[in-house]
UniProtKB/Swiss-Prot annotation:
It comes from Rattus norvegicus. It is found in: Cytoplasm, Cytoskeleton, Microtubule organizing center, Centrosome; Nucleus; Cytoplasm; Cytoplasm, Cytoskeleton, Spindle. The gene is Nme7. Residues 22-110 form the DM10 domain. One of its GO terms (molecular function) is protein kinase activity. This is Nucleoside diphosphate kinase homolog 7. Transmembrane segments: none annotated. Its EC number is 3.1.-.-, 2.7.-.-. Widely expressed. Expressed in the flagellum of epididymal sperm but not in testicular sperm (at protein level). InterPro entries: DM10_dom, NDK-like_dom, NDK-like_dom_sf, NDPK7, NDPk7A, NDPk7B, Nucleoside_diP_kinase. Keywords: Cell projection, Cilium, Cytoplasm, Cytoskeleton, Flagellum, Hydrolase, Kinase, Nucleus, Transferase. CDD domains: NDPk7A, NDPk7B. Its main location: cytoplasm. Component of sperm flagellar doublet microtubules. Component of the gamma-tubulin ring complex. Gene3D superfamilies: 2.30.29.170, Nucleoside diphosphate kinase-like domain.
Amino acid sequence: MKAGQQGRSCGLISPYLAPKNQSERFAFIAEWYDPNASLLRRYELLYYPVDGSVEMHDVKNRRTFLKRTKYEDLRVEDLFIGNKVNVFSRQLVLIDYGDQYTARQLGSRKEKTLALIKPDAVSKAGEIIEMINKSGFTITKLRMMTLSRKEAADFHVDHHSRPFYNELIQFITSGPVIAMEILRDDAICEWKRLLGPANSGIARSEAPGSVRALFGTDGIRNAAHGSDTFESAAREMELFFPSSGGCGPANTAKFTNCTCCIIKPHAISEGMLGKILIAIRDACFEISAIQMFNMDRANVEEFYEVYKGVVSEYNDMVTELYSGPCVAIEIQQSNPTKTFREFCGPSDPEIARHLRPETLRANFGKTKVQNAVHCTDLPEDGLLEVQYFFKILDN
C-alpha cells in the first residue's frame, strides 16, 4: 500500500466475511522443519473455505502428501504470509502465496501496523485488546517493554521540534508500554479510527466509544498510539520488533516473587486474551511482564518435560502449546504460585465449573488440554518458568 492510501474508504467487504464460493480454494507455499532428517521441507498447502478442508503436496517430490481432509483448527484468518499454522501436528510457516488468485484475495489489502499502549493505559490493556479483537484485528506480536530516552527519541523523531517534545519523552519513558503488531484489511486506517482523535478531550466529544475517549486524559496522556502511514508503521515496528533478530527495547520481567501464566493458543485464537487479562487484573494480580511467543515442538517438550510420563494428556498438551501463538505472563503477588494456581482452578474445566466456578479455567476452558491457561504448579518452579520465557526464549 502506498503512503497516501491510508485514508481510503474502509467499507469494502473483506474476503473473510464474503459468502463462501463452493469451488474456492486458497494456495500457499509452506515450509516445515523435519527434526528427524534435519531438513526444511516445502509443501503446497491448499485450503478450501467451503468446508474447512486442507490438502498438501510435496513440492520437491511432486506428489500428494495429504489428501483433502477436513481440518477444523485452521481458519481463513490464519492464512497470511509469515504466520505459523499447525496442520495435524506439523508446524508450517507460510512463506509465499501459491497462486495469483490467493495473492489477490488475501494479500492485496492486508496490512500490519503498530498499536502501542502507553504507560497511562497499561492497566487497561485487557479492555483495549478486547476492543482490538472485536474490531477484526489479529494480534501477531505483543510485548511489554520499557523505553530508554534514546529509544523514545527514535520513536518520537517526527516530534523533535514540537514544544511538547520533552513532555512526550518524559511520559513515554515513565513506565512500561505494550507494543503490538496488529493485522487486518486497512489496518492503519481502521486502528486510527478505533483510537479516535489524538486529544482525549476532543475524542470524548467526537468519538466517545474510541480508545482515547475511554482511557486517555489529554493530548499527551492519550492511552495509545497508532502509525499514520505505511512508511511510519514499518519504521516504528522495526524499533519495537527488529527484523534483524534483535530483541528491541528491554522486557519488563522482574524475576522476583513471581509465577508463570501461559494463555494457550486456543484461547488466543478464540479471542479470549483481553477477557483473561481483565480477569487476572480484577483478581488483584500484578502483570509485570507479558509477551506473545510462537513456540516450536522442541521448546514445548523442554518446557513440559516435568509432565512427561506423569500426565496422560502430555502429548496433547505439547501439540496444543505449539499449535499457534501463546502469551506468557509474569505474575506477581505475595505467595504468587499458590494463590495464582488456586485462581486458575482445577485443570479439568468441567470439574472447575462445578467446584470453582469463579476460576479462569471454569470461565474460559473447554477441555483438560484446552483449559485456557497453564500455571506453575510448584513454588520452586515459578522463577524457572518465568526465566524460560523472558530470559531464554526472549533472547
